[in-house]
């Protein structure tokens, strides 16, 4: 049987980090087994579902590179199908109409709680076979088995057993004519041939209810894999403040999509002690059965380390468009400075994110207007005009502007003055960047461009008073 998985977000908000991990595991499992991955949008919550959220989910999936074979399929476009299946259950005596008011339902729950019983629907309409009538309280309830046990072998959690006596007759169609979650997902997964349902363990309590509906329909029951939640760095439930942010905020924070994929894959799954995986390695090695049953903790330092690894090892040309995105966010005209790929080469050993890289790179895209006063006092003092002047002379004479030629010119300047390279590099670094800290001096000067470098040296000479 062909493996078919699905990711089924509810568009009531953006795709957060937990949802992204679920999507990734569903995608990896399908790809690993040579199957198909389906995207379904569970948008039947009409009050909370928005097109903005749908667009954000699709954008995040695209950014992460999680392509799907079918979809997006929208539940709101399948209402007639849900009605058809509900009517089938009604005709077979496996579901029934109920018309209790909100006050009557509240009274049932209060009576149960007074007896120290689980608050639940008491089955008042179960055997009445009430006909359809136009009523604002009309619902359709599923006849849950009264006896027996629901047993399933979760691919992550192991064997789980729930007594049917713990379950009541849940609503499968609401008064507004829309199906409930537990009913719609069963019909969807049945129609779509889903063989493995991979989702968060907050859905475990829904699973026995859903299995009973599958069996009532005579539908094949898929395998289930319930992943533990992701905790924050203190071991508490994730919040927006502690990492449960929109996935695209990770893009804005300067993380590479494949670095986030690598990190999320390891957030609950492992292959020995290996930390870094190419996409092909993930596809070859991933098996949902190997997902840890214990909750994983978000570790932003680890994510930063993984991201820096890919900044250091990826082709700079592939990183360049993402650096340009960060620069534009800062209001930078990327055409007004060096090629982004060259900036990546210069800075990738010094930063963990593209956001940091862009912030450090601004100095090469805008006129230098501010200087670190301590750096000026230390390195642009009287006497610094000599190495700066010689460096300017050598740089101005270059026929071709390249890192290698800039390096040769600066070393020639130091040799001509019989100075150590540091005596040339430090005043030049302050002249070019306004600070004492920058990448290799040859790269620092090269990235300023010939005209920009000479102009900044001239400004520094004026500052020294020796123009």
Curated annotation (Swiss-Prot):
Motif 'HIGH' region per UniProt: ranges: 9-19
Signal peptide: none
Reaction(s) this enzyme catalyzes, per UniProt: tRNA(Glu) + L-glutamate + ATP = L-glutamyl-tRNA(Glu) + AMP + diphosphate
E.C. numbers: 6.1.1.17
MF GO annotations: ATP binding; glutamate-tRNA ligase activity; tRNA binding; zinc ion binding
GO biological process: glutamyl-tRNA aminoacylation
Function description: Catalyzes the attachment of glutamate to tRNA(Glu) in a two-step reaction: glutamate is first activated by ATP to form Glu-AMP and then transferred to the acceptor end of tRNA(Glu).
Protein family (similarity comment): Belongs to the class-I aminoacyl-tRNA synthetase family. Glutamate--tRNA ligase type 1 subfamily.
Stored PANTHER family: GLUTAMATE--TRNA LIGASE, GLUTAMATE--TRNA LIGASE, MITOCHONDRIAL-RELATED
Name this polypeptide is given: Glutamate--tRNA ligase
Organism encoding this protein: Xanthomonas campestris pv. campestris (strain ATCC 33913 / DSM 3586 / NCPPB 528 / LMG 568 / P 25)
High-level lineage: Bacteria, Pseudomonadati, Pseudomonadota, Gammaproteobacteria, Lysobacterales
Originating gene: gltX
């Amino acid at each position: 049987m062909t493996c078919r998985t699905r990711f089924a977000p509810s568009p009531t908000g953006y795709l957060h980090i937990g949802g992204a991990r679920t999507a990734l595991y569903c995608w990896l499992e399908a790809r690993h087994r040579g199957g198909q991955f389906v995207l379904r949008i569970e948008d039947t919550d009409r009050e909370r579902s928005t097109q903005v959220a749908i667009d954000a989910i699709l954008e995040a999936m695209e950014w992460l590179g999680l392509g799907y074979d079918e979809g997006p399929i929208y539940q709101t476009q399948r209402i007639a199908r849900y009605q058809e299946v509900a009517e089938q259950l009604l005709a077979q005596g496996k579901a029934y109409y109920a018309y209790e008011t909100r006050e009557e339902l509240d009274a049932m729950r209060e009576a149960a709680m007074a007896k120290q019983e689980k608050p639940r629907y008491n089955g008042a309409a179960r055997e009445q076979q009430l006909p359809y009538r136009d009523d604002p309280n009309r619902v359709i309830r599923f006849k849950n088995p009264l006896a027996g046990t629901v047993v399933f072998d979760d691919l992550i959690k192991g064997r789980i057993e729930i007594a049917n006596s713990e379950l009541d007759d849940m609503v499968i169609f609401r008064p507004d004519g829309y199906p409930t979650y537990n009913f719609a997902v069963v019909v969807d997964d049945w129609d779509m041939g889903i063989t493995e349902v991979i989702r968060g363990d907050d859905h475990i309590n829904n699973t026995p209810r859903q299995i009973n509906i599958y069996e009532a329909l005579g539908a094949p029951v898929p395998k289930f894999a319930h992943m533990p939640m992701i905790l924050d760095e203190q071991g508490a439930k994730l919040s927006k403040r502690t990492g449960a942010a929109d996935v695209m905020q990770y893009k804005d924070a300067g993380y590479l999509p494949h670095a986030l994929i690598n990190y999320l894959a390891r957030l609950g799954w492992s292959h020995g002690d290996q930390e870094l995986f190419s996409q092909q390695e993930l596809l070859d090695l991933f098996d949902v059965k190997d997902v840890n049953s214990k909750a994983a903790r978000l570790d932003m330092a680890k994510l930063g380390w993984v991201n820096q690894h890919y900044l250091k090892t990826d082709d700079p040309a592939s990183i360049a468009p993402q650096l340009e995105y960060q620069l534009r966010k800062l209001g930078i005209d990327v055409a007004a400075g060096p090629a982004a790929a060259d900036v990546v080469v210069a800075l990738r050993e010094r930063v963990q994110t593209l956001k940091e890289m862009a912030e450090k790179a601004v100095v090469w895209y805008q006129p230098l207007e501010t200087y670190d006063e301590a750096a000026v006092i230390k390195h642009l003092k009287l006497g610094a005009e000599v190495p700066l002047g010689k460096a300017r002379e050598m740089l101005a004479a270059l026929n071709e502007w390249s890192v290698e030629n800039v390096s040769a010119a600066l070393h020639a300047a130091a040799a001509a003055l019989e100075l150590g390279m540091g005596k040339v590099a430090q005043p030049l670094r302050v002249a070019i960047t306004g600070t004492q800290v920058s990448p290799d001096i040859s790269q620092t000067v090269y990235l300023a461009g010939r005209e920009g470098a000479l102009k900044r040296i001239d400004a520094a000479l004026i500052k020294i008073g020796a123009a």
